[in-house]
């Protein structure tokens, strides 16, 4: 597929058979509804996508303790090939034709389908009634912000929900954004915050001076299971219309396995976690004051 430096691509991270299968399903959606658009996939097994003409698959080895922050590598690869990239979770679906020039890539910076300023994100913490998980997330994010001389409670800093967002080049600010995200990813993971990467995305963008804005992402009709449940609850969608997408995702993401297979997978996951955590601790010793004081 031709790579247009002035155009855009979709991109995702798909490691492990379950997510490779889901990404392949998404690739077929993109081929159908956005036929001239490349889909950049970072994956542990590029050969799984060799028969999918719209996919540009690149070998990826897990870098984060858990995979959440590795999304930045998919974005970096997309931006090395195109002017804009739209990150989309591998377990999502595209449901209708996508415009050749989506509005979400028309402005430099980050345009997210879901984002909110940090005071709103942590309103329960600031009001004094958070749950334990949110409080831990707030404490780690606040310390991370202070390391970059930022104030987490600043209304101009946004938490970015990472399932669907576009990044358009902005005179090199996008490169600094990715650099700061890497720093923040390590800090958050060292402090036990492996997910909620929207904190790192928002703080990194603020530090780099990269604009962040919300958008309804007009022209990108999508399925995301947890979003769809909310739509159904609000009467904006019907379960009978979306049932096939729920069924396909469940079948691929949670396939039936023998108990022996489950034990092996769980053991391998634990070993990888411990290895990646040890690796992170060793690598961050080179900047001891930043990460450990």
Where are the model-predicted features located?
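Glycosyltransferase catalytic domains, chiefly GT-A lineage
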Residues: 1-293
